[in-house]
């Protein structure tokens, strides 16, 4: 009976050692779980970005309004008989005023 108890105790110690310090132990599991959560968050952000890019691509394929908007904003293009006004912001500089 004592031998059986000793063998069970040794097996318990070995299994506990592997559980806490061996390969694929509890600390390794916790690190991997944290990495999975971080990667899922990054994937969600990328999926949202992809949805926006697909919507933008579809808009460019189907409608001329998006092309016109990009041409105006990025290239500064204007239509015929249109007047372009460029507003330059006033600088906030201090001037010496002689009184």
From Swiss-Prot:
Its main location: membrane. GO terms for cellular component: cell division site; cell septum; plasma membrane. Pfam families: DivIC. The chain crosses the membrane at residues 4-21. GO terms for biological process: FtsZ-dependent cytokinesis. It is a single-pass type II membrane protein. InterPro entries: Cell_div_FtsB, FtsL/DivIC. It is found in: Cell inner membrane. The keyword Protein transport does not apply. Residues 1-3 are cytoplasmic. Residues 22-99 are periplasmic. Belongs to the FtsB family. NCBIfam families: PRK00888.1. Essential cell division protein. May link together the upstream cell division proteins, which are predominantly cytoplasmic, with the downstream cell division proteins, which are predominantly periplasmic. PANTHER family: CELL DIVISION PROTEIN FTSB. This is Cell division protein FtsB. The gene is ftsB.
């Amino acid at each position: 009976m004592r031998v059986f108890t000793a063998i069970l105790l040794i097996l318990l110690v070995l299994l506990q050692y592997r559980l806490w310090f061996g390969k694929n132990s509890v600390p390794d599991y916790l690190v991997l779980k944290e990495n999975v959560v971080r990667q899922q968050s990054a994937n969600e952000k990328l999926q949202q970005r992809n949805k926006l890019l697909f919507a933008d691509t579809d808009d460019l394929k189907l409608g001329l309004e998006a092309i016109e908007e990009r041409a105006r904003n990025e290239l500064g293009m204007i239509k015929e008989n249109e007047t372009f006004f460029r507003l330059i912001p006033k600088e906030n500089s201090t001037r010496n005023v002689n009184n």
